[in-house]
Amino acid sequence: MNQNKPIWVAGLMSGTSLDGVDAACLYTDGVDILGFGSSAYVPYSAKEREVLRSGLGKWPGDTSLHEVGVVVRDLHMQALQNLPTVDLIGFHGQTLSHDPQNGRTHQLGDGAELARLVGTPVIWDFRSEDVAKGGQGAPLAPIYHWALARYAKLLEPIAIVNLGGVGNLTWVDPRLPAENGLLAFDTGPANAPLNDYMIKKLNKSYDEDGNLAAQGVADLNLVARFMRDGYFARPVPKSIDRGDFSYIGSVVESLSNEDAAATLTAIIVAGILQALEHLPQNPKQMWITGGGRKNTELMRLLRSAMPMRVCDIDEMGFDGDMVEAQAFAYLAARVARGFPTSFAKTTGVATPLSGGRMSIAEVF
């Protein structure tokens, strides 16, 4: 693998929504996007999702994590089998716990084992060093968002919002170098509390098209109460763990299912709207990526609330299902070349840092 020339990289991502494994190929030199390749999605079964949920909040060394690790390994292997041969793999793993205030983060998944199994070098453990050096360890996709804006030849700032289990916002000015043209942070909860509620109350994995929320009325007093959570007063950049807002389910417990779904959806929008106060300037466009963009009611509310054009990133010619997986392909290429993956205004790390470690496939 020539690290100074463009290479094909496969990125693997399993997010906090616990939907499944996204896998995508990217042709890149670690600076520019030079081509998009094949992608694959392997959904988790109900049983696999249950196993993964059992690991949430746990840390390395917990003996109950063996079965969780097997699910992570096997499903990622299955995703890779649906892709062509590549030069490098970027493997995020499954976030189980994230506590940057105490210098800890846990992404389950053994990149060294994956490299042995597939015979390809693997970049993994992207977040630990950033957290160890005082950063938040998240979000990491912003540098890829910068590359996307450059690929689209944008000439003015834009906001890219990923709606996974947690919401993340990246403000990008593509006219500037990444270190100066990025600001990123977590906006608050996104799909996770709503999905958890749907599973608990209705035995459904998510609110399809936002149909349940559309039938309800949001309790704006509860939304305002939630927005007084101390997280929203913290300076940016900042990040959260999926479990930090697990109490939301009990907050809406007294509401009907329809009103609870509407309230949980309104909370997502309120977090993003509040996030705009932190931006250097309001962009004219907001691109939405991640699973939340498929929630018709959520997108309707965002378009109504935001003071700029809001669009599904697919409308711009990108695959919104695969942006996160592509991001970890791009990050892997950057790590291989020693380029920084996080910055002061994305994770809060003091100086630009190239996180992640490489495991080389063993040759016998």
Residue ranges and their predicted role:
Residues 59-111:
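Short beta-strand-loop/turn "lid" adjacent to the catalytic site in phosphate-handling enzymes
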Residues 96, 283-303:
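Glycine-rich phosphate-binding loops at beta-strand->alpha-helix junctions
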Residues 18, 314-364:
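Glycine-rich phosphate-binding/hydrolytic loop that grips phosphoryl groups
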Residues 35-71:
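Conserved non-catalytic scaffold segment of RNase H-like nuclease domains
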Residues 75-83, 257-282:
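Phosphate/ATP-binding catalytic cores across multiple sugar-kinase/actin-like superfamilies
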Residues 6, 20-34, 39-44, 178-269, ...:
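Conserved ATP-utilizing enzyme core subdomain
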Residues 25-32, 102-113, 146-150, 173-181, ...:
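A glycine- and small-aliphatic-rich helix-loop capping segment at beta-alpha/alpha-beta transitions
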Residues 4-8, 100-105, 120-204:
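Phosphate-binding/catalytic loop of phosphoryl-transfer enzymes
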